[in-house]
Every structure is written in C-alpha cells, then in structure tokens.
C-alpha cells in the first residue's frame, strides 16, 4: 500500500495527470468562450443555455469539484466555506442547484486563494474561473495556480490587482 504522500514515481504520475486535467480544462474554457454569442437581448437566452451547458461539462470533466469536497480538502466545514465566499475569499459556481468550486483550489493553501480572490470581489464567477485557468504571459505562461505553487504568489496578486483595476472589479481589501 502506498502512503498518503506516495513515492517519487507516484508524485510524477500525479503531476502528469494534473497537467493533462489542466490542459483539458483550458481547452474546455477556450471552447466555451468560442461558443458564447455576442451579448444582446435577443441572444440572452441562447447565451444562458450555452453557459449552462459549458458549466455542466466543467463539473463532469473535473474542472470544478463539489464545494463540499473543497471544504473537506481545506479541513473546514461547509458553513465556514460559505463564510469564506461571503468574505470574497473564494468563489463558488451554482450549477443545477449545487455549488461547485474550481478544482485547482484544493491544491492550494486557503490563505493564498483568499488573497487572490479578494483582489477582484465584483468580478463574475466565470471571469474569475478564466483568470485562474488561463496561462498568463506575465507568469511565464503558467496559470495562477501553477505560479502560486512555484512560489510566485506576490506576482499573481499584482496581475489580479491590475486585472481588477482594468475591469472595474474593485478590491475587497488591501493585500
């Protein structure tokens, strides 16, 4: 039986699986973005349907995990996760009546996720998800999660602040 922390080869295998999952997630985000029609009143219903279809796909393909799983991974109660969401420390997506969280959050410290999420409190959930999943040139083509894992939290915060300022998403608190 392999220990919880595994061996070097199991760590490498997990890293490869994580990389493939992240690659599929980016492809899904790109596909969803290409399907989204221009926003007009006549297209609003179609956009909602496409958005819902994409969101359901994200739950099936591992981009999102149930919020209860994130709470468990972070060692907190579901109520504490709700409070974190109210404090802009995390964001959740409601899909078909259930709350889902970005799977990458489970790989990161709660405090790091909170610092980044608080920089853009008024951004919509999909914009936040795209921020977390897209590689950024300023991060050496890494996603914010990859950059944080590589010790670049401060750089991720700089980029998040700039994006929030550019889009008028405001700040919940100074970081």
Model-derived segments and spans:
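Non-transmembrane "mature" sequence context
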Residues: 1-175
């Amino acid at each position: 039986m392999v220990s919880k922390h595994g061996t070097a080869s199991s760590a490498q295998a997990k890293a490869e699986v994580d990389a493939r999952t992240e690659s599929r997630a980016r492809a899904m985000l790109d596909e969803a973005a290409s399907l989204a029609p221009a926003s007009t009143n006549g297209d609003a219903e179609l956009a909602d349907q496409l958005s819902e279809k994409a969101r359901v796909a994200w739950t099936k393909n591992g981009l999102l995990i149930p919020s209860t799983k994130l709470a468990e991974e972070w060692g907190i109660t579901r109520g504490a996760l709700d409070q974190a969401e109210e404090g802009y420390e995390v964001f959740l997506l409601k899909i078909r009546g259930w709350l889902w969280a970005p799977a990458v959050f489970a790989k990161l410290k709660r405090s790091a996720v909170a610092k980044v999420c608080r920089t853009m409190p008024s951004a919509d959930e999909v914009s936040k998800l795209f921020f977390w999943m897209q590689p950024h040139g300023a991060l050496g083509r890494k996603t914010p999660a990859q950059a944080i894992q590589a010790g670049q939290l401060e750089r991720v915060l700089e980029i998040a602040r700039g994006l929030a300022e550019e889009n008028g998403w405001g700040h919940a608190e100074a970081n």
